[in-house]
């Protein structure tokens, strides 16, 4: 019984990883805490203000781009500090650098046709367009990579089981 439940749980983890999608448009940011705080400071945003902005209850406003310019500039600041560059030297969307699939590239391009000229609003729109297109920053090269990611967890779980219990995936 325990064996079956554990196998189902691990299978759900693998499926979740392979289907991973951000719950908020900005969940993919990998910047350091210092970068995050610096961007907030530069844009005169408190932690409390950011938490309200990033709250799931505010998602509708975020997706409709119905947010203050300082929040858009904060997102621009954070995106500029990301290791994967989404903009070219002219500050325009760079779908190749973003590693967008052909399908998401078409969606992002179409969405960006109505992008504002103001730089913070432009970058904010890009992030929203990427999110709406399903562009994911979480990419696995292969199924083997998922197995490698979960192998340690499986080994730990197996070590905790009795000799006659096994984990089959």
Curated annotation (Swiss-Prot):
Annotated signal sequence range: 1-20
SUPFAM superfamilies (alphabetical): Insect pheromone/odorant-binding proteins
S-S bonds: 39-77, 73-120, 111-129
Source species, domain of life: Eukaryota
Keywords: Disulfide bond, Olfaction, Sensory transduction, Signal, Transport
GO molecular function: odorant binding
Gene Ontology biological process: response to odorant; sensory perception of chemical stimulus; sensory perception of smell
InterPro entries: PBP_GOBP_sf (IPR036728)
Gene3D superfamilies: Pheromone/general odorant binding protein domain
Gene Ontology cellular-component annotations: extracellular region
Record field: transmembrane: none
Function field: Present in the aqueous fluid surrounding olfactory sensory dendrites and are thought to aid in the capture and transport of hydrophobic odorants into and through this fluid.
Entry's family note: Belongs to the PBP/GOBP family.
Designated name of the protein: General odorant-binding protein 57a
Species per Swiss-Prot/TrEMBL record: Drosophila melanogaster (Fruit fly)
Upper lineage: Eukaryota, Metazoa, Ecdysozoa, Arthropoda, Hexapoda
